[in-house]
Amino acid sequence: MMITLRKLPLAVAVAAGVMSAQAMAVDFHGYARSGIGWTGSGGEQQCFQVTGAQSKYRLGNECETYAELKLGQEVWKEGDKSFYFDTNVAYSVNQQNDWESTDPAFREANVQGKNLIEWLPGSTIWAGKRFYQRHDVHMIDFYYWDISGPGAGIENIDLGFGKLSLAATRSTEAGGSYTFSSQNIYDEVKDTANDVFDVRLAGLQTNPDGVLELGVDYGRANTTDGYKLADGASKDGWMFTAEHTQSMLKGYNKFVVQYATDAMTTQGKGQARGSDGSSSFTEELPDGTKINYANKVINNNGNMWRILDHGAISLGDKWDLMYVGMYQNIDWDNNLGTEWWTVGVRPMYKWTPIMSTLLEVGYDNVKSQQTGDRNNQYKITLAQQWQAGDSIWSRPAIRIFATYAKWDEKWGYIKDGDNISRYAAATNSGISTNSRGDSDEWTFGAQMEIWW
């Protein structure tokens, strides 16, 4: 009996430790891709994106090692009320050597509190850096609605007919505003904070298995006292989004219409660039000295239209399919906008529940508003893949691939005084450009991809 009693405190301590470990369990999520590739004409793998487009078809066309490592934990819970702490650190290297150092990007650090407001059951309040309700096309790694960044908000307010979310986030432009109170040029340029205010109404039932989401984003440049924006800067802008999601064929189809103005047109995803101004402006100092400040960003006064349809569906036991079709027109007052349309498919044939063959075919066409000339490219990738499951979304996956790309480009980009590409222009203008001309290339390699 004495032996039993002596063992009791140890047993209690062990049990308490186990229970504590379970209560403090950390959620580990993330994403990663890495591989090796070669180019037919020699050297390491090249990747292909048509000049003027904002994305590329990604299968067999990614030349970097990239990872996002997310750690999170529910740190407090009482009934249906809880606090959750979430973090995300991202890394990207060129996958050229064994030892490749990089500065990590601290992309998320936020706290989310659920059911904390008694009269708004089911809602979540949050603050910090966060990936906020992002909308993207996986096939081309294109985010068309993404206001992520430092911010705060409340989401999923149940209105009965839909759920309302309100948020404010920030994105900052380097060297976007100027002051002339100092003789030191290094004190005269300051980063410009852009504030975005986001309102979304989701879950609106429109038809059987179909829902609608509506959103309005307003973004504006928020300058520090004593600083001002360049003449012609757009200062602010709006973006309106309507997205219909239809559940179908064991997958979904999303149809999206977006319209943006001025500061919201540069990135076209809900983040503002309000200090984009005129190409240059001159100020005279008190001593009579004149200084010309080159504004190394595009004047983005104008508008953007985007019509997008994309999805992922199952076509039977053996076939899955991803697809995308998009038209985007950026019409700027300075005539430096673009018209971009793209269409692509990625069918998957499943030989076994863990082995498949994928074919990705994508075409891009981008027209210069200034000249009317067009750049175009098509890319074809054939890949043999082994994945953890029989879905086109199953990961991890290991694949070997061969890619062929053919392009014909008629225009490039004007370069500023620092030889940095900034403005869309035609090659026949006589100005230095980086148009790729008319050529083709093929690559081959192997890649892993995982999310968890």
Curated annotation (Swiss-Prot):
Q: Which GO terms describe its biological process?
A: monoatomic ion transport
Q: Which keywords does this Swiss-Prot/TrEMBL entry list?
A: Cell outer membrane, Ion transport, Membrane, Porin, Signal, Sugar transport, Transmembrane, Transmembrane beta strand, Transport
Q: What induces it?
A: By maltose.
Task: Site Greasy slide, important in sugar transport: list residues.
Answer: Y31, Y66, W99, Y252, W393, W451
The Swiss-Prot or TrEMBL record annotates one GO molecular function as:
maltodextrin transmembrane transporter activity
Q: Which GO terms describe its cellular component?
A: cell outer membrane; pore complex
Looking at the UniProt record, the site noted as Important in sugar transport sits at: Y143
Keyword Ion transport applies: yes
- Cleavable signal peptide: 1-25
* Catalyses which reaction(s): beta-maltose(in) = beta-maltose(out)
Output the CDD domains linked to this UniProt entry: Maltoporin-like (cd01346)
Subcellular localization is given as: Cell outer membrane
Q: Which InterPro entries match?
A: G_neg_Bact_CarbUptk_Porin, Maltoporin, Porin_LamB, Porin_LamB_sf
- Coiled-coil region(s): none
Query: Does the record carry Transmembrane as a key word?
Result: yes
Q: What is the protein's membrane topology class?
A: Multi-pass membrane protein
The free-text function statement in the UniProt record for this protein reads: Involved in the transport of maltose and maltodextrins.
What interactions and quaternary structure are annotated?
Answer: Homotrimer formed of three 18-stranded antiparallel beta-barrels, containing three independent channels.
Task: Identify its protein family.
Answer: Belongs to the porin LamB (TC 1.B.3) family.
Q: What is this protein called?
A: Maltoporin
Q: Which gene encodes it?
A: lamB
